Every structure is written in structure tokens, then in C-alpha cells.
Design a protein with these regions (language model features):
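A generic "binding-loop/recognition-motif" signal
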Residues: 11, 64, 107-108
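Hydrophobic pocket/interface hotspot
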Residues: 15-16, 112
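A short beta-loop-alpha structural element at the N-terminal edge
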Residues: 2-15
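Conserved active-site alpha-helix within GNAT-family acetyltransferase domains
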Residues: 100, 106-134, 138
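A conserved beta-strand-loop-helix scaffold within acyl/acetyltransferase catalytic domains
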Residues: 30-42, 47-48, 54-72
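C-terminal "cap" of GNAT-fold acetyltransferases
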Residues: 125-172
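Helix-loop element at the rim of GNAT/NAT acetyltransferase active sites that forms part
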Residues: 18-30
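Conserved acetyl-CoA-binding loop-helix of GNAT-fold acetyltransferases
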Residues: 73, 79-94, 104
């Protein structure tokens, strides 16, 4: 039987292996071991018979928004409910933090629609876009579908940010 629990530092290598298996083909963004160690408290793992068979993280932007990210299960575990249990655990964590909206970006929207997520416009999630997406190599050609569950934030403050002007004019 699959169960979930909060990740701990000794889990990082197995989390890394699961994410790496999906980042090679572009399904997930790659995560370094150092990044995973720094953010291990964001992760939940799925275990079956004492072996980690899946992972997922909840990144908090504030009480108005959190993102489910890096969610994956081993190929042998697909279809056994591990993914659903991971999402449920992450949603409970968001609820514990009183987060009013949980978003995610995915290529499997049907899975998340069955869990109560709805389609979103990228413009509705500026915190995610300005903090993370702008650094992604696929930013201008992103094929992921934005989804949310809860109440889309009406105003987060990010839209009011001014782009800093360069201190010097660079010429080539």
C-alpha cells in the first residue's frame, strides 16, 4: 500500500533520481541535489514497502498562492494512486498554511482536473511567472497548461513591480 510522508534529507538522492528520470525528456524541470537539499522541507514522498516511489513539492508564494511542482512517480507505480495521494498530501499542506489558491503547470491536465483543478490563464499567476517561468529555457515556447484550485489571487503586488533600469548603457 502506498502512503505519503514529509521528505527528509536522507530521501534527497531518491527524489533526485525520480525527478531526473522525467527531466531528461523535458517533462519536469531538472533539480540539482543542492537545490533539493535546500528545499527538502517543501517535499512529500510516496512510499511503498519502505521504498520511495514518488515525490512532489509545495512551493509557497504567500497565503494567496502556492504551487505544486516536481510531482512524479516511478513508472512501475503509475496507476496505483501514488500521484493522487501526493497531490492530496500537498493540498492538505497548503490548507494547513491557509493558502487560498494552489496552482500548477502540467502536460497532464486531465489527471489534475479529476482532482478539482481548473484551467487558468498564465496572466492570473504573475508570482509564478515572474519568479520562476522567466528563468526557464522554454519560457517563450512553454507547452505546459496552467491550472489552479481555490480562489485566483486578485492582486499579489507582483504586477506593480518596476523593471529596474540599467545603471550603465551597454554597447556592443
Amino acid at each position: 500500500m502506498v502512503r505519503t510522508r514529509n521528505a527528509i534529507l536522507p530521501d534527497v538522492e531518491q527524489i533526485h533520481a525520480i525527478i531526473r528520470a522525467y527531466s531528461g525528456n523535458g517533462t519536469l524541470l531538472p533539480r540539482t541535489l543542492a537545490e533539493l537539499r535546500e528545499n527538502v522541507r517543501d517535499f512529500v514522498v510516496a512510499e511503498e514497502d519502505g521504498k520511495i516511489v514518488g515525490c512532489g513539492a509545495l512551493h509557497l508564494y504567500g497565503m494567496h498562492l502556492a504551487e505544486i511542482r516536481s510531482i512524479a512517480v516511478t513508472p512501475s507505480t503509475k496507476g496505483l494512486g501514488a500521484g493522487r495521494k501526493l497531490v492530496e498530501a500537498l493540498l492538505k499542506e497548503a490548507e494547513r498554511h491557509k493558502v487560498t489558491c494552489v496552482c500548477l503547470f502540467t502536460r497532464i491536465p486531465d489527471f489534475f482536473a479529476h482532482m478539482g483543478f481548473s484551467l487558468a490563464k498564465r496572466d492570473d499567476l504573475p508570482d509564478k511567472i515572474y519568479k520562476d517561468c522567466v528563468h526557464c529555457p522554454a519560457f517563450n515556447a512553454c507547452d505546459e497548461i496552467a491550472m489552479y484550485r481555490g480562489e485566483i489571487p486578485q492582486h499579489s503586488g507582483v504586477r506593480d513591480l518596476q523593471i529596474p533600469k540599467p545603471l550603465v548603457k551597454l554597447t556592443v
